[in-house]
């Protein structure tokens, strides 16, 4: 599948709940996701919901944006829990 053919549902770590979050954020395509900041998406989602969202959601956003930007991303980095480990170490997450 070419990078242009990928859909949001094709990204690793993206399930039905995340697809709903993308819709809430106005993201409908991988191309739109590629131009977004995972940190900003997380902040916007917290604001839209009016509550603090589990930070694992941020990890999924980072994994999804990284895949959108790099279709050849290493398999391990496509998993949300890879980014969860990075975040918990205090390292800067990709944006």
Which residues make up each language-model segment?
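C-terminal extensions
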Residues: 1-12, 16-95
């Amino acid at each position: 599948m070419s990078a242009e053919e990928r859909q949001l549902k094709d990204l690793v770590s993206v399930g039905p709940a995340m697809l709903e979050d993308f819709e809430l954020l106005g993201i409908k395509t991988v191309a739109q996701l590629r131009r977004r900041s995972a940190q900003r998406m997380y902040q916007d989602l917290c604001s839209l919901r009016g509550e603090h969202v589990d930070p694992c959601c941020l990890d999924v956003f980072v994994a999804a944006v990284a895949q959108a930007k790099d279709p050849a991303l290493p398999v391990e980095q496509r998993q949300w829990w890879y980014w969860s480990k990075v975040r918990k170490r205090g390292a800067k997450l990709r944006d």
